[in-house]
Amino acid sequence: MKTERVNVNVNNQPYPIYIGENLLQDKSLLQRHVKGRQVMIVSNETIAAFYLDPLKAIYQDFQCDTFILPDGEQYKTLEYWERILHKLASCNHHRDTTLIALGGGVVGDITGFAAACYQRGVDFIQVPTTLLAQVDASIGGKTAVNHPVGKNLIGAFHQPKAVIIDLNTLNTLPEREFKAGMAEIVKAALIKDEKFFTDLENKMSDLLQRNFIFLQAVIKRAAEIKRDIVNADEKERSGERALLNLGHTFAHAIERLLGYGQWLHGEAVSAGLVLAAQLSHRKNLLDFESLQRICRLLTQISLPIHFPKSINADELLSAMYMDKKVANERLHLILLEDLGHAVVSDQVDDRELKSFLENG
């Protein structure tokens, strides 16, 4: 298989995304984006068991330190972020060090935030090992940790020097996590590319069988969609990047109310996508057949299309207001005018939203 490359250029900070097989064995590639002689690999207990030793071997001629997190969203906290910084300082890492995030979205987010803050900013490389991280979390420079009040409330924008996606890491990904990652691919299609959505409908059976040929193609297309949006609006100033939050205002509230880790992020995103589509239909933006197609595709993946019955409408609405997409005390929701055409809207008031959440 030929390695595919997607080039990102954010504010004249270009970096590549590589997508291929056996990239974790490519010494030249993995050393190419390290400018100094120090690296620190951050991973979690689950991923480290599979991939840490081979990656350390690539950097055997470097000062190579490691930090291993427990596995789970509940560890994406200021406490563990501070522990990473302490390890960097105690091991005497300099400004030319490079952090390597080996893992899923939690590892990538907390490592990127540590890199953004250590000595006012050092390099880092994303090596995402989950489908969700490969198509979304590793691209675009958003780094953060959670706070009890809300998800990703404390963070920074800090672009990686490279994103290295080894498709072989998907072989060790549990089925539930693999399917959760599909939600972000569906989201990308809904935002910008109706043809891509149709391709997903036609190829989903092969994708769920982890066919690498099809997976490489859809990961590349999802990465291109995110690349184009991030290039145009790195820090959500113009509203373009906000489109990437389709379904996420609902999803982040669901995750927080259930307790981080009870639902995977992609599972909450799936329910959020359906809520956004249903609300779009209610406001006469999205036709019923398109809504049905979205529900059918997510159901085929075995992802949730309803928010949990244990959460009531008042709780969900209150939690949504802790989202970063609140401006001037109004929720800015991402809605759909069509498959492949998302828009930012502040035209949903609390009364309408509460009625929608209570009655659908």
Swiss-Prot record:
GO terms for cellular component: cytoplasm. One of its GO terms (biological process) is chorismate biosynthetic process. It comes from the Bacteria. It is an enzyme of class 4 (lyase). Binds 1 divalent metal cation per subunit. Can use either Co(2+) or Zn(2+). CDD domains: DHQS. Zn(2+) binds at E184, H248, H265. Its cofactor is Co(2+); Zn(2+); NAD(+). It catalyses: 7-phospho-2-dehydro-3-deoxy-D-arabino-heptonate = 3-dehydroquinate + phosphate. It is found in: Cytoplasm. Pathway: Metabolic intermediate biosynthesis; chorismate biosynthesis; chorismate from D-erythrose 4-phosphate and phosphoenolpyruvate: step 2/7. Pfam families: DHQ_synthase, DHQS_C. GO terms for molecular function: 3-dehydroquinate synthase activity; metal ion binding; nucleotide binding. Catalyzes the conversion of 3-deoxy-D-arabino-heptulosonate 7-phosphate (DAHP) to dehydroquinate (DHQ). NCBIfam families: aroB. This is 3-dehydroquinate synthase. It comes from Coxiella burnetii (strain CbuK_Q154).
